[in-house]
């Protein structure tokens, strides 16, 4: 495994976690998936489970990156905990179900689910009103029932695909009146319960017959996660001066542009 390259992956993940709430998954999953396929023989256990390893390692990275980004946003005063608390328990429950399902899905199917999820997210944000421009009113908190109904699928899909909750929570909060700064800041603490629950499942409940070798805890590549975490720390340090300095429109466009870049990477990366 090329650890300096993983450090660069982590640096990109750190920047996008702090500024866009991605938690690292949108960079870590496609890049680690591609690296695993190119560094292991076709048909080997690691190659056959490359997507699961990428997703599981991404979830582990998110524990570190989302926690650090949450701390930085708390210091910057950009967090709204009244919007975070109602969603967190349902996201954690959904994440456990999503991670368990990912263990038993074929890696190719998981890849295409990831691609489909990205494409739908882009189309929804671009075509449905409420994402590119929001009103002047402040964000409206979700009620308990609405938070549960929204949190369960957010947690399940985020853990299934290893992407964090940003791609669902940011559009949700945008359409409830949140600025991009507030919406992306809240994506980080909302990714934490997902990352913790998913990592627990990926570490302790591996799929039967998956003998992946040393250095892995369940499906989690611990060495890759550590290398990317080091890069993520540096990336957040470099991105910190930009917090609160991006215009809302530029922030929203950059968010969608990053999703489009990841979609292209996943489309051109295959077995």
Residue ranges, per PLM feature:
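Juxtamembrane transmembrane-helix boundary motif
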Residues: 1-20, 27-53, 57, 66-160, ...
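Conserved, well-structured core segments that form the ligand-binding/active-site neighborhood
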Residues: 163
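A conserved regulatory-domain signal marking ACT and ACT-like small-molecule sensing domains
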Residues: 185-189
């Amino acid at each position: 495994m090329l650890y300096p390259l993983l450090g660069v992956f982590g640096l990109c993940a750190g920047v996008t976690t702090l500024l866009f709430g991605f938690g690292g998954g949108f960079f870590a999953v496609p890049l680690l998936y591609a690296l695993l396929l190119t560094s292991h023989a076709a048909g080997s256990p690691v190659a056959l489970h490359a997507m699961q390893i990428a997703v599981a390692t991404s979830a582990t990275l998110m524990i570190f990156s989302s926690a650090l980004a949450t701390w930085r946003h708390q210091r910057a005063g950009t967090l709204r905990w009244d919007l975070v608390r109602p969603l967190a328990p349902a996201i954690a429950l959904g994440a456990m179900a999503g991670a368990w399902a990912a263990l038993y899905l074929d890696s190719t199917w998981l890849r295409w689910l990831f691609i489909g999820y990205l494409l739908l997210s882009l189309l929804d944000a671009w075509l449905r009103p409420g994402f590119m421009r929001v009103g002047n009113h402040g964000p409206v908190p979700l009620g308990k029932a609405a938070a549960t109904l929204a949190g369960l699928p957010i947690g399940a899909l985020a853990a299934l695909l290893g992407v964090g909750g940003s791609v669902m929570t940011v559009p949700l909060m945008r359409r409830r009146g949140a600025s991009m700064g507030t919406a992306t800041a809240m994506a980080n603490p909302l990714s934490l319960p997902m990352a913790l629950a998913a990592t627990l499942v990926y570490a302790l409940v591996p799929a039967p017959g998956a003998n992946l070798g040393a250095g892995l805890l369940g499906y989690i590549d611990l060495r890759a996660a550590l290398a990317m975490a080091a890069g993520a720390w540096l990336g957040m340090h470099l991105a910190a001066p930009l917090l609160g300095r991006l215009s809302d429109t530029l922030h929203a466009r950059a968010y969608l542009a990053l999703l489009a870049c990841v979609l292209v990477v996943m489309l051109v990366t295959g077995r």
